[in-house]
Regions:
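Gram-negative outer-membrane beta-barrel transporters
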Residues: 598, 742-905
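Transmembrane beta-strands of outer-membrane beta-barrel pores
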Residues: 162, 182, 193-197, 214-216, ...
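C-terminal beta-signal and adjacent terminal beta-strands/loops
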Residues: 755, 848-851, 895-907, 928-979
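Short loop/turn motifs that connect adjacent beta-strands in outer-membrane beta-barrel proteins
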Residues: 46, 183-186, 199, 215-218, ...
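Structural signature of Gram-negative outer-membrane beta-barrels, strongest in the C-terminal barrel
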Residues: 451, 458-462, 466, 569-658, ...
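Surface-exposed beta-strand-turn/loop segments characteristic
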Residues: 88-94, 98-112, 132, 136-151, ...
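N-terminal Sec signal peptide and the immediately downstream disordered periplasmic leader
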Residues: 2-81, 87-93, 207, 211-212, ...
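C-terminal beta-signal and terminal closure region of outer-membrane beta-barrel proteins
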Residues: 456-458, 462-464, 635, 648, ...
Length: 979
């Protein structure tokens, strides 16, 4: 954290203000900029509007009734959450599952943030701005919502149901439509500061918005500038991470025996006898190096002489290096953005409009020291002068005593590896809209956007340079001062600066995505029925996306430690579309039929290269009385494979599998429940078939806690298809008694069934299914499709698990959303003579099922109520707000609730189920104070009771930073000016 930011926060901390509540409201009605209200708005309560737009429909219905379940989030709700990024505010709602965000992304995330409706994936919901697609932020079709300056947002509409027939591919789980604020005259300034109560996580945000009307109000213009900054939070700043991520890649270095060229048992016993060890040592296991040159068995910590602090520990009897303190839990983040939109009435019936968006964001991510994880592995020749005497004895006892040996370790003498990422987005849009004749209107636009992601990896250890030093007859001393001695922690940390410079480099890569869009739409009334006009909308569009990836030569040659190599890649997809929607009012203003109507929509999309698809929708609405709306819809939704799924290069990452039997680990490990269980003989046979040498099979232990996971595109993919069903009601009774006049609630049931799912297979799932931990491979056959994804080296060690994109099985989920609102004007109830009111609002989500069928014909597994890293699926989730507000002051309390969760291992490997997570509750307080008509102060405290970080057993870092609060109790203060 910079001193400047610290000083700003200390000064700002003297403001004792908190934020006015606003509401998440289910919509019977939606208008272009829904006001903050405490009740469900209805068509009767709002005056007629000439040009109504309803999110989720191509038709502007005169009665302003929304058939799709829609939740509207006001801009005030975003502000009172105390966050400086939009996704942190929206992810508090039950319908969202925390996904990638600007703080928790690792390599390649670029400070980007995505939204994930229903836990179905961030690329299965569509994110729009004023009903139009936003620039893509990555090759997987995701949209970074943090490219939107908060100062331009008037409200957010969230459709929690399929909408492919209306909006096209990607709208399987729903749509999030950000609506820009209405045009205005004047200047608006907003500033907000915040920090943790520990003073180690500063956040700052400022925005400036200018609006003007000109040429006799025929022209309207809005300009917004925004700046946001957030400090990093490392694992060393939270005690929770002190012992987390116990890595088997340790700073002392380790000798990795070759199963086909093992040291003799006699030599090994003799060396350890010198240390007073009489128990035979498993000669297939890694041996580490003490500072005095003696050896220790990493498994069992036999003869380990320390250290046992400063990042070293004995975990489960094994020597490990907890790297949790080295990890950057929340990234540093800086964003600058500019947005402009304007329109000009050329005639009374024709308006030209344009829009511009520019974003420049930078994030720095650090991930700890580099390690020797991915092939090709580092080897050391027997001629290296630094080899300790006892190790030389073992090397000489091998069948081939002159063969080089593999060295495993972590480069603790070099600074932590990290990434400086810059992410720039530009979008240009222009169009015409107007009236054709009567009720018939048109809107046509073209747009172009470009996203450039530049990445600089610093302190990248080059394998070729390390190998050159180790191969040198003098240990590399002639190449850099002192050379490289990797044996023992003291030697490893004594690396000269000259050698550090020799071994490392800054490695560059660059991604470019571009999108071109053209779309035209007409809509109007075909004819009138007694209940109202029959309306039709027609749409035609074209969209093209291109992608290009240029990696550094060191990445192409797989020359960077801890990083899987990647090749240049490029790809292109395009689509031509036609859509139609019709709305038919059947009855109105009759007994039991205040309104009855039906609608339908159809979309034809022709994708290059994956072919044509069709989607459609049928919906119905019935208001038996004015206060009650019953609604339902059925949709066939589609999602075509995106550029990343089709063309992405191999992308590798570390896949944590843990150490058996406490975790799944390598099932071939003799300590695993797979080997020790009733089917141990069958598992042993499968492990032999996979290449573990017979000489090593009965002593085989996987020495590390992680392996590689390699994701790659697949241009043979076909589109996903989904059937979605929604039914529910909204009740807004308008009781005459003041205690109930502000009461409303809604209940909606959703059911989504996706087939031909495009996805990668989780590496832990691959292991569980290959080794029949869940019954998927009862024959223990190595030809099983999951076993074919497992890669082992000639010694049998688990090198990587391939995770290509595939058309897999199915994904089925269903649940219920409930929204309850209540408010009371105190003066109406005879309490006081002021204009204040009290209110309560609760959004509740209940998840019934979340079933995943990995492959067609296989059994489904229900993950409801499980703690899946990056995708928690609680059965219950709720956001509840209570408070008081008046014309000048407001104060409230917010309760965020997430139900208990089982660990994912309860489903994937029940025999090795790990501990789950208890119910999680967070409380926030907030308030506003209006000094005058032009100045408002706000502030609040989040995580009021300083709730600690929960342990997530199956997560690589021991928790889920995207779901749980890593910071602890925090405060924010802000001010809004207008003039």
């Amino acid at each position: 954290m910079t001193p400047t930011l610290n000083s700003r926060l200390r000064l700002g901390g003297s403001l004792a203000t908190l934020a006015l509540s606003s509401f998440v409201v289910p919509a019977i009605a939606q208008d272009q900029a829904a006001p903050v209200t405490t009740t469900t708005p209805s068509a009767v309560d709002q005056p007629p509007v000439a040009d109504i737009v309803v999110t989720g429909s191509l038709i502007a219905r005169p009665n302003n009734v929304a058939v799709s379940p829609i939740v509207t989030v006001s801009s005030e709700l975003v502000q009172q959450s105390g966050q400086i990024t939009l996704e942190d505010s929206l992810n508090q709602l039950p319908g969202f599952t925390p996904s990638g965000n600007a703080g928790t992304g690792g390599q390649g995330a670029g400070g980007r943030a995505t939204l994930n409706l229903r836990g179905l994936g961030s690329n299965r919901n569509l994110v729009l701005l004023d009903g139009r697609r936003l620039p893509l932020s990555d090759i997987n079709g995701n949209v970074d919502i943090n490219i939107l300056p908060e100062s331009i947002i008037g409200s957010v509409d969230v459709i929690t149901g399929g909408a492919s027939a209306i909006y096209g591919s990607d709208a399987m789980s729903g749509v999030v439509n950000f609506k820009t604020d209405r045009y205005f005259d004047g200047v608006r300034v907003d500033i907000q500061n915040g920090d943790s109560f520990r003073g180690d996580y500063g956040k700052f945000n400022a925005s400036l918005a200018l609006g003007t009307k000109f040429a006799g109000d025929r022209g309207r213009l809005m300009l917004a500038l925004s700046y946001g900054k957030r400090d990093p939070l490392s694992g060393s700043q939270r005690d929770f991470f002190a012992d987390k991520v116990p890595s088997s890649f340790i700073g002392t270095g380790a000798f990795v025996p070759d199963a086909l060229n093992l040291p003799s048992q006699a030599a090994l016993n003799g060396v350890f006898a010198q240390y007073g060890v009489t128990t035979p040592i498993n000669r297939t296991l890694n041996l580490g190096f003490n500072n005095n040159g003696s050896l220790f068995a990493q498994t069992g910590a036999i003869n380990y002489q320390g250290p046992t602090s400063d990042g070293y520990a004995v975990v489960g009897g094994n020597v490990r290096m907890p790297v949790g303190p080295q990890l950057q839990i929340l990234n540093a983040f800086e964003r600058k953005s500019a947005f402009a939109k304007g329109e000009f009435d050329l005639t009374e019936s024709l308006t030209a409009y344009g829009q511009f968006l520019y974003v420049d964001s930078t994030v720095t991510t650090e991930s700890g020291g580099s390690l020797t994880q991915f092939a090709p592995f580092t080897t050391i020749p027997v001629t290296n002068p630094h080899i300790p005497t006892d190790l030389r004895t073992l090397l000489a006892s091998r069948a081939d005593p002159t063969a080089p040996f593999r060295w495993s370790g972590r480069y603790v003498g070099i600074g932590d590896k990290g990434w400086d990422e810059n992410y720039r987005v530009q979008q240009y849009l222009g169009g015409l809209k107007g009236t054709i004749s009567g009720s018939w209107k048109f809107d046509a636009f073209v747009s172009y956007d470009e996203t450039i992601h530049s990445q600089s990896m610093f302190n990248a250890v080059l394998k070729s340079r390390v190998q050159t030093l180790l191969n040198a007859a003098d240990g590399g001393a002639s190449l850099c001062a002192g050379g490289f001695n990797p044996f023992g922690i003291t030697n490893a940390t004594s690396l000269s600066q000259e050698c550090q410079n020799y071994m490392t480099a800054t490695v560059q890569s660059r991604e470019r995505l571009a999108q071109t869009q053209a779309q035209g739409q007409v809509n109007g009334a075909l004819f009138d029925l007694p209940a109202g006009p029959v309306q039709l909308a027609l749409l035609a569009g074209y969209r093209k996306n291109t992608y290009k990836y240029d990696p550094s030569p060191d990445l192409v040659s797989n020359n960077v430690e801890s990083v899987v190599g990647s090749n240049p890649a490029r790809g292109e997809i395009s689509v031509k579309e036609f859509a139609a929607q019709i709305d038919v009012p059947l009855l109105s203003d009759t007994p039991f039929f205040h309104e009855l109507g039906v609608g339908a929509a159809f979309r034809y999309s022709d994708y290059n290269p994956t072919g044509s698809v069709k989607s459609y929708e049928f919906d119905a609405r019935w208001q038996p009385v004015q206060a009650l709306l019953i609604r339902g819809s059925y949709q066939r939704a589609v999602r075509a494979p995106n550029i990343g799924e089709l063309f992405s290069p191999v992308t590798g990452s570390q896949l944590a599998i843990g150490t058996p039997p406490a975790a799944i680990g390598d099932p071939c490990d003799i300590r695993s429940t797979a080997r020790t269980g009733i089917n141990g003989a069958q598992v042993r046979g499968l492990c032999l078939a996979q290449g573990i040498p017979a000489a090593a099979i009965d002593a085989y232990q996987f020495a590390t806690t992680a392996t590689g996971g390699n994701i790659q595109g697949n241009n043979a993919l076909t589109p996903e298809k989904a059937n979605t069903f929604n039914v529910g009601f909204v009740f807004n009774p308008k009781f005459s008694t003041p205690w109930l006049s502000g009461f409303s609630f809604s209940v909606d049931y959703y059911n989504i069934k996706i087939r031909n799912v495009i996805s990668t297979i989780n590496g832990l799932t691959v292991l569980a299914k290959c080794y029949n931990l869940d019954g998927s491979n009862s024959g223990y056959s190595n030809s099983n499709e999951f076993c074919q994804l497992i890669q082992r080296d000639p010694t049998g060690q688990l090198v990587a698990i391939a995770q290509p994109y595939l058309n897999l099985g199915a994904l089925d989920t269903d649940g219920v959303d409930v929204q309850v609102n209540w408010s009371l004007k105190l003066s109406d109830a005879g309490i006081g003579d002021g204009s204040g009111k009290i209110y309560a609002s609760s959004a509740i989500g209940w998840l019934n099922h979340y079933k995943v069928q990995t492959l067609p014909g296989t059994a489904s597994q229900d993950f409801v109520g499980t703690s899946t890293p990056g995708r928690p699926l609680p059965k219950w989730k709720a956001l509840t707000t209570v408070g008081y507000s008046s014309d000048v002051f407001g104060v409230g309390l917010r309760w965020r609730y997430q139900g208990k969760l089982r660990d994912i291992s309860a489903v994937t490997s029940p025999a090795a189920e790990q501990v789950g997570v208890k119910p999680y509750n967070l409380f926030d307080i907030f308030s506003t104070l209006d000094i005058n008509d032009n100045l408002q102060l706000r502030g609040g405290i989040t995580n009021l009771f300083d709730k600690g970080i929960p342990f997530v057993a199956s997560s690589q870092n021991g928790t889920d930073p995207g779901t749980y609060d890593m910071v602890g109790r925090s405060f924010y203060v802000g001010a809004k000016f207008k003039f």
